[in-house]
């Protein structure tokens, strides 16, 4: 499919530089969960969709503020949106109604990293709909002074055997063990090989594409610990050329991995991706603080959820 720039719509202008990452107040959101409920007051044709996120003036049947107005009332500076690139677990042209079987997934099963998810568009069969409507959503949030952090999952794909990576260069884009089996440190059946030149370039080009063409204000890296520090350094450098205040943060869990510990983007290696004084560096979700407050997520019971 070839789309003209006119057909894809305009992204508008970037928001002004934000400041320090530590000044951000971030709410996490799934597009469908946020707007699918029939009682939300959001227009029926926009429920569960990109455009439902930015419909204003909505209230529930009981008169409570909902949708965009509710999000604004939280006073957040950023909304971190769960994966909104194309993912594999939902049939985009199937039944997407409220409570429909198989219509909901958080999207941590990537297919096409650089294509918006079609199930969030008004017409998944029309390629331009998902592009223009995602841009409208981002512009609508920006208009209301809310910046957008995109949740990205470059550490694994939905199905390695059928993925375009393996069809392009079989065996190159993924990690394999000594027995020739796919490495599964992610727990998702396959791990991408960020340390290889073209996978690294793909990741850097991808975030650059989203930042330039959709004016994305930040990126949250899923299982960032499985991505090497050199790749993350290049991600930061590429985004700095667009806007040094773009937020980059991620899950720097110290996981079992075939990678050398010194190369993993984990908290002990945070100094390798820290701010150089001209940018925001790369931030980490801190499981050490979490576990200090509530105990280990794997072995301790707690009434606290963090």
Where on the chain are the PLM-derived regions?
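Active-site capping/gating regions of soluble enzymes
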Residues: 218-219
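Active-site flanking residues adjacent to catalytic metal/cofactor-binding acidic residues
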Residues: 27, 150, 250
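Extended hydrophobic/Leu-rich segments
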Residues: 8, 304-305
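Tryptophan-centered motif/residue detector
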Residues: 8-11, 210, 253
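Substrate-binding/active-site clefts of carbohydrate-active enzymes
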Residues: 32-62, 66-214, 232-243, 247, ...
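Active-site-proximal helices and loops of the catalytic beta/alpha 8
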Residues: 101, 108, 223-304
């Amino acid at each position: 499919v070839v789309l003209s720039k006119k057909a894809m719509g305009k992204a508008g202008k970037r928001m002004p530089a934000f400041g320090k990452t530590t000044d951000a107040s971030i709410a996490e959101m799934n597009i469908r969960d946020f707007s699918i409920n029939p009682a939300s007051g959001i227009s029926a044709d926009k429920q569960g969709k990109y455009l439902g996120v930015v419909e204003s003036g909505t209230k529930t049947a009981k008169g409570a503020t909902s949708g965009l107005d509710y999000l604004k009332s939280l006073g957040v500076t950023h909304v971190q949106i769960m994966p909104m690139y194309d993912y594999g677990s939902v049939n985009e042209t199937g039944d997407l109604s409220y409570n429909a079987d198989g219509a909901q997934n958080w999207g941590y099963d990537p297919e096409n990293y650089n294509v918006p998810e079609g199930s969030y568009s008004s017409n998944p069969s029309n390629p331009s709909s998902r592009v223009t409507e995602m841009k409208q959503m981002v512009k609508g949030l920006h208009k209301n002074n809310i910046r957008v952090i995109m949740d990205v999952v470059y550490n694994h794909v939905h199905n390695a055997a059928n993925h375009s990576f393996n069809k392009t260069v079989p065996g190159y884009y993924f990690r394999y063990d000594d027995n020739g089996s796919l490495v599964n440190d992610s727990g998702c059946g396959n791990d991408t090989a960020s340390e290889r030149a073209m996978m690294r370039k793909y990741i850097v080009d991808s975030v650059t594409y989203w930042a330039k063409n959709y004016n994305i204000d930040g990126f949250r890296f899923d299982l960032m610990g499985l991505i090497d520090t050199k790749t993350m350094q290049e991600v930061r450098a590429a985004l700095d050329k667009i806007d040094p205040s773009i937020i980059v943060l991620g899950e720097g869990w110290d996981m079992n991995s075939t990678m050398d510990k010194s190369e993993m983007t984990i908290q002990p290696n945070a100094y390798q991706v820290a701010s150089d004084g001209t940018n925001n560096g790369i931030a980490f979700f801190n499981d050490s603080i979490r576990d200090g407050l509530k105990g280990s997520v794997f072995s301790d019971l707690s009434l606290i959820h963090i």
